[in-house]
Amino acid sequence: MRSCLSIVLAAGEGTRMKSSLPKVLHKIAGLPLVCHVIKQIELAGASQLAVVVGAGAQDVTHVVQSFIKSVMIFEQKERLGTAHAVLSARLALQKEVDDVLIVFGDTPLIKQDSLLKVREQLAVGADVVVAGFYASDPTGYGRLLEKNGKLIAIVEEKDASDEEKKISFCNGGILALNGKRALSLLEKVNNYNSKQEYYLTDIVSIASREGLEVQVVEVPFDNIVGINNCFELFEADSLWQKRKARDLMLSGVTILKPETVYFSYDTEIEQGVVIEPNVYFGLGVKVQSGAVIHAFSYLEGAVVGIDAQIGPYAHLRPGTELARSVKIGNFCEVKKAKIGEASKINHLSYIGDAEIGAQTNIGAGTITCNYDGFHKYKIVIGDHAFIGSNSALVSPLMIGNGSYIASGSVITEDVPINSMAFGRARQVTKKDYAAKLRVRLSGNQQKK
């Protein structure tokens, strides 16, 4: 297997984002742009990874090192162009590798297939390989100049002639170099251009003049699209969501209106699941086969068991684990709770820091009072228990198997197995008193 050093350029300021957050840390599907790129690079077989940081260097470094442990970080102190940025990783380039793969950290839709296609050309003898795409409107992109079927140069639009601007074959931003020639080619790049910057793209013309083998590989535009502003971020996120929905549907997931469903990068959904419109999947969600996620539900950090029913209008928060055939109904919020098989929380409830057994029913309006302003406390409810409507369960608390809690109760003490607990004031009924009350109240109103 060929060894590969991949260098990710993540030093740009991203001024057009109009944000204090470094551009590469903006997120698509809950994952920073640069991490999307790193993920695909790993899948494409890179054995070494270097990331060049600049604007927001400390924040970018922290995110990257949290995402992947084995990474070299280099800082570009001055913004002198893309070739200068790559040379900031000189120490990595001095190591002996077969391939050097250079990509931009703001291209989150990049796919391993495109990266592998570029690397394949190095494997068969190319010294320089560029990814290119055909654009219906090439405005803003560098143009690929060919002669006799050979790529001879890349010219940036600001430096292109009127004739060159008519070319629709554009630079896709992925560059691969023969590892033995990479450093020497980079050191030959000069800054003789309108911006006096060291362009990475000049490597193509340098290699061509030296008679080296230069190749171009066509890749789909949606694989290499870059992010420069918040609208482009939205467009890229929308495309990512379409890809995810398509992959899920082809794997056997039914999504009734996919354009209204939002997935995170790590969402796992098994075949046979049905997802109704307007559902949000935050980070860390796994949905097992046969489950139904009804409309307007919000899930994050939750595991949904086989054949479970969620919603509509349900909120599953981090730490939620639902066993087989659990039902979480309308306007219910569940947080950091394990719910046993076939248990039901059907209406208007908050269940937090709890463990509930199998085939237990939680009545409408029940809440767990798990926080005293300083600490969170846990409640444990056994199997086959029945919690009546409008009950307040004050943690810490244990309710035994088969126990029954009367509606409207405030329960503050443990309830043994197969017991019944009342925790409410006794009802007082005054017969025929309503008519007297109306007379008294109407008299008070007339005096005013």
From Swiss-Prot:
Mg(2+) binds at D106, N228. The keyword Acyltransferase applies. The keyword Ribosomal protein does not apply. Residues 1-230 are annotated as: Pyrophosphorylase. Its cofactor is Mg(2+). Its EC number is 2.7.7.23, 2.3.1.157. Transmembrane segments: none annotated. It catalyses: alpha-D-glucosamine 1-phosphate + acetyl-CoA = N-acetyl-alpha-D-glucosamine 1-phosphate + CoA + H(+); N-acetyl-alpha-D-glucosamine 1-phosphate + UTP + H(+) = UDP-N-acetyl-alpha-D-glucosamine + diphosphate. It holds the Pfam family Hexapep. It is an enzyme of class 2 (transferase). The active site is at H347. Keywords: Acyltransferase, Cell shape, Cell wall biogenesis/degradation, Cytoplasm, Magnesium, Metal-binding, Multifunctional enzyme, Nucleotidyltransferase, Peptidoglycan synthesis, Repeat, Transferase. Acetyl-CoA binds at A364, N370, Y371, S389, S407, R424. Residues 231-251 are annotated as: Linker. GO terms for molecular function: glucosamine-1-phosphate N-acetyltransferase activity; magnesium ion binding; UDP-N-acetylglucosamine diphosphorylase activity. GO terms for cellular component: cytoplasm; membrane. Binds 1 Mg(2+) ion per subunit. One of its GO terms (biological process) is UDP-N-acetylglucosamine biosynthetic process. Catalyzes the last two sequential reactions in the de novo biosynthetic pathway for UDP-N-acetylglucosamine (UDP-GlcNAc). The C-terminal domain catalyzes the transfer of acetyl group from acetyl coenzyme A to glucosamine-1-phosphate (GlcN-1-P) to produce N-acetylglucosamine-1-phosphate (GlcNAc-1-P), which is converted into UDP-GlcNAc by the transfer of uridine 5-monophosphate (from uridine 5-triphosphate), a reaction catalyzed by the N-terminal domain. In the N-terminal section; belongs to the N-acetylglucosamine-1-phosphate uridyltransferase family. In the C-terminal section; belongs to the transferase hexapeptide repeat family. NCBIfam families: glmU, PRK14353.1. This is Bifunctional protein GlmU. It comes from Bartonella quintana (strain Toulouse) (Rochalimaea quintana). The gene is glmU.
